[in-house]
């Protein structure tokens, strides 16, 4: 196998965006290949048994790193487990691999080898996430905010107000999607953005001038705007009942004086960083367990590939023998009018064996023992 890759470790996101592969053109040009592209990763996987012109591939992917053989296979298994992701153990990459593989299969661009490899990688990614805690705990600020709210207040059947529909608000929204929330309300100065995010969350969008009513209705408030001024001041929160407010904005959205209310618990981005850092450390501690799974499954994969190779060799050899049989049989049929059956069968069997041994000897004379053991000599002997 051959992998060409470019990712966030080497290139900034704007550069990666310019390096993205035109998948329509890619799949028109190559066979036995799969492209996996995310916002911070571009990778193409090639079955080199089919794509033998490696130089052509390398010329097309100037600037990409190149991995081959065992190194390429281990890399892909690590990618599927989230071990190569910007956020260690993240779940999204596994779904992206599945989608990319499905597209290549629908286009009939995979091979028996790539089918086995991708199915194994998906299985390994699933094992890593079910048998270890590599994907547990919020490590982004957005997911940490949701985790904090759930831990301190519980989110099941709660009403959550999200103030801000920008980048940070969207991160929170993605984390909220996994929870059994009663209702989600999204408010933003640009109402259309609130509407779009609310639709994704199957929630409700409210205009900014209706914020007071939304606060009264909510149990948990998450603030994530880019405003240079406070969105919520102390006077805005008189008589609103018990609330948890999580302020992940920078600069802050909520006046610290809000802490004076006994019925309101205010958490800031500093509290979330502590949670995020602890969760990252927990994930790092799971790395050896994931690597053990990868090593185990790699050995299983190698046995599967060896079996596939043997089956392909036997198939090719049978075709080679059948080709000789047909040719020698045609000669025997032509002789059937002038010679007796016993003589014809004798000549046929000798010619059949002689042709096979001749091809083998011709190829093996100038071939090392190691190369001979690893070769399909009958292809070269023709």
Curated annotation (Swiss-Prot):
It catalyses: (S)-4-amino-5-oxopentanoate + tRNA(Glu) + NADP(+) = L-glutamyl-tRNA(Glu) + NADPH + H(+). Possesses an unusual extended V-shaped dimeric structure with each monomer consisting of three distinct domains arranged along a curved 'spinal' alpha-helix. The N-terminal catalytic domain specifically recognizes the glutamate moiety of the substrate. The second domain is the NADPH-binding domain, and the third C-terminal domain is responsible for dimerization. HAMAP family: Glu_tRNA_reductase. Substrate binds at residues 38-41, 85, 90-92, 96. NCBIfam families: hemA. During catalysis, the active site Cys acts as a nucleophile attacking the alpha-carbonyl group of tRNA-bound glutamate with the formation of a thioester intermediate between enzyme and glutamate, and the concomitant release of tRNA(Glu). The thioester intermediate is finally reduced by direct hydride transfer from NADPH, to form the product GSA. GO terms for biological process: protoporphyrinogen IX biosynthetic process from glutamate. It comes from Methanococcus maripaludis (strain C6 / ATCC BAA-1332). Pathway: Porphyrin-containing compound metabolism; protoporphyrin-IX biosynthesis; 5-aminolevulinate from L-glutamyl-tRNA(Glu): step 1/2. NADP(+) binds at residues 164-169. Homodimer. Disulfide bonds: none annotated. InterPro entries: 4pyrrol_synth_GluRdtase, 4pyrrol_synth_GluRdtase_dimer, 4pyrrol_synth_GluRdtase_N, GluRdtase_CS, GluRdtase_dimer_dom_sf, GluRdtase_N_sf, NAD(P)-bd_dom_sf, Shikm_DH/Glu-tRNA_Rdtase. GO terms for molecular function: glutamyl-tRNA reductase activity; NADP binding. The keyword Oxidoreductase applies. Belongs to the glutamyl-tRNA reductase family. Signal peptide: none annotated. This is Glutamyl-tRNA reductase. It is an enzyme of class 1 (oxidoreductase). The record marks 75 as: Important for activity. Keywords: NADP, Oxidoreductase, Porphyrin biosynthesis. Its EC number is 1.2.1.70. The active site is at residue 39. The lineage of its organism: Archaea, Methanobacteriati, Methanobacteriota, Methanomada group, Methanococci. Catalyzes the NADPH-dependent reduction of glutamyl-tRNA(Glu) to glutamate 1-semialdehyde (GSA).
